[in-house]
Swiss-Prot record:
Keywords: Kinase, Transferase. The keyword Transferase applies. It comes from the Bacteria. This is Uncharacterized sugar kinase BUsg_057. It is an enzyme of class 2 (transferase). PROSITE patterns: PFKB_KINASES_1. InterPro entries: Carboh/pur_kinase_PfkB_CS (IPR002173), PfkB_dom (IPR011611), RfaE_dom_I (IPR011913), Ribokinase-like (IPR029056).
Amino acid sequence: MKKKLINFKNALVLVVGDLILDCYWYSKNYYVVLEESLPIASINKIKKQPGGAANVAKNIAEIGGNSKIIGFIGMDYEGLTLKKLLNHTRIYPDLISIKKNKTITKIRILSEKKQLIRLDFQEKYISKKFNLLYEKIISSLTYYKVLVLSDYAKGTLVNVKKIITLAKKMSIPILIDPKGLDFKKYSGATLLTPNLSEFEQIVGKCHQEKQILQRGIKLVSELNLSALLVTRSKNGMTLFQPEKQPIHFPALSKTASDVTGAGDTVISIIASSLATGYSLEEACFYANVGASIVIQKIGTETLTINQLNTVLNI
């Protein structure tokens, strides 16, 4: 595929899903007290970043696209922090605050580029404001060109079938980063982007390449998908489409420092590409390059359009 400079300045992408505040606590001094077998981490740096669907919106903005993010947050300090982190000229945060819920927060403690432990503060959203969520989606789809549903199984997309139906009526491409053991609820989507582990939870463990290919083709048919993209970390990604041979995109690097947020990078680039007018094959090619860059970084890292173009034109 011919290399060229790309830009997503005209991309308009609506992102809906579970909003997460990602916190990183860095330690330069980590040791274990032998008498108590107690690990001690002296924290010297704290970093906070948008996570989940919020990271998708940020990724789109960082590569030059325009995103609107719709989702739930709690009426708490973490919710306010997440709002501030989404203060970007290319992000329009349309967040719904809920009194009864805390903002979903994940804290990762790291030392020497290794993750020691992750602490999750979360509960599924049970709200009377779902009708407001759907109203916001409907009004937004008259302007935005592509819909991304970022599902982390925290309750925002509890009725994902309804959202898919709404978007299909308006002929809007629907890209979904799926979660859980029920992929049937995503039937009729334009594209699903599970990682290999999520894919195998649905189709069974794949011990050979041909099993991945056969089961991918079958899943596209069973779920009536326009396409399925299985992301495979250091092994790249594989695209399945009805009545077409699978296309494999090898990773640029065979090592992965941290795959956190790589799926967000993939779906962000694909959404921005489709909203700009690129083909799905081109979009996946760009996404594979972007993911290969991001997995070399630690944490929920975003990619810039300059970084992407630099690697594309090496």
